[in-house]
A protein has these predicted regions:
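Walker B catalytic acidic pair
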Residues: 127-128
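Conserved helix/coil segment N-terminal to the catalytic DExD/H
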Residues: 77-96, 101-120, 134
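Conserved P-loop NTPase motor "coupling/switch" region that bridges the ATPase
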Residues: 38-40, 54, 59-70, 74, ...
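Pre-Walker A adenine-sensing motif
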Residues: 1-3
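P-loop (Walker A) phosphate-binding loop of NTP-binding proteins
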Residues: 15, 45, 159
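Hydrophobic positions in the central parallel beta-sheet of the AAA+
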Residues: 12, 97-99, 124, 153-154
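Conserved Helicase C-terminal RecA-like lobe
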Residues: 5-9, 18-19, 23-45, 104, ...
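Substrate-gripping "pore-loop 1 plus following alpha2 helix"
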Residues: 111, 117, 131-146, 302
Length: 303
């Protein structure tokens, strides 16, 4: 917090459980108290926006800060519209808008976020910033376009690199296009990746063969980011994995084998089928737990 609170751009690369959410909210509070901001736009995955709204902000935002906090909803009812309009009232309050990252693929979400950014001095933060790692994604482009209207920008994630170091480019570009000294993704890729040509179905494509200059990239990141690992700050015992072997009932085994072999199983006249491997694995897990969800939505118990 000491390193980042007054910087226009910063990255919290802190693993889960090391306090990055509290650090960001404390940062918001400090900037508000200093008169630097009067608004905050929190962008998070759909699965955690309610946690931000219902738990994190009420728990960690200091009590002395008057705030108006609104959770974005795609279906705007009259009541929801009143809540959204409250973000433009009470001039002395800290106005906080929590939006899911998917909203930035919609015209409605972009339009309201633009209005909010133009109406306040805003800190714009992305929780789990790997959600904008794909340069060609519509939401990535829209969020980056909107970032120029924010006075302060923050990104947060425990794993800034999910597949390869190239994931860092758009996350850092959101903060500032010049932080990594590359104005385009392709120049960045050419600096830190070795490409090779592959022939696929009559076409020639470029794929990553290896990486290079990673120590240089790491040095650049240190200027505007803070990395925290669980092992550095939490006294946790090592994970203890226990294998448990469980015998399936005859009916379970029959349904399990059907699903495993054909991706389709029948019980009590109800059929469950799968179209993808991940769904098939989920169905197999359900069967081992003594039930499965049929294609018509009913749950069938397996004895």
């Amino acid at each position: 917090l000491e390193k980042s609170w007054n910087k226009e751009t910063y990255a919290y690369f802190m693993e889960m459980g090391t306090g990055k959410t509290k650090v960001l909210i404390d940062n918001m509070a400090m900037l508000y108290d200093k008169g630097k901001i009067d608004g905050a736009l929190i962008i998070a995955p759909k699965g955690v926006i309610k946690t931000w709204y219902e738990q994190e902000i009420p728990t960690h935002l200091p009590n002395h800060i008057e705030n108006v906090t609104v959770l974005w909803q795609p279906n705007i009812t009259k009541k929801q519209q009143e809540k959204l309009e409250s973000l433009f009232e009470i001039e002395t309050a800290l106005h906080i808008l929590v939006m899911n990252v998917e909203a930035f693929s919609t015209e409605k979400g972009i339009k309201f976020a633009t209005k909010f950014l133009n109406s306040h001095k805003v800190l714009m933060a992305i929780d789990e910033s790997t959600t904008i790692k794909t340069p060609t994604a519509k939401r990535t482009k829209n969020i980056i376009d909107l970032s120029e209207y924010a006075k302060y920008r923050r990104i947060m994630t425990g794993s800034p690199v999910t597949k390869n170091p190239l994931d860092l480019y758009t996350q850092c570009y959101f903060l500032d296009p010049y932080l990594l000294d590359h104005a385009s993704y392709y120049s960045f890729r050419n600096r830190y990746a070795v490409m090779k040509s592959m022939h696929v179905r009559g076409r020639t494509i470029q794929v990553v063969h290896a990486f290079q200059n990673l120590s240089e990239l790491s040095d650049k990141l240190q200027d505007f980011s803070y990395r925290v690992l669980k092992e550095d700050c939490l006294d946790l015992p090592p994970k203890n994995w226990i294998k448990r072997h469980i015998t399936l009932s005859k009916e379970q085994q029959k349904v399990y084998d059907e699903m495993k072999k054909t991706a389709l199983a029948t019980l009590n006249g109800k059929v469950t089928s799968t179209m993808t491997v991940i769904t098939q694995l989920m169905r197999l897990q359900q069967i081992t737990c003594g039930h499965f969800v049929a294609d018509d939505g009913t749950t069938q118990e397996i004895k």
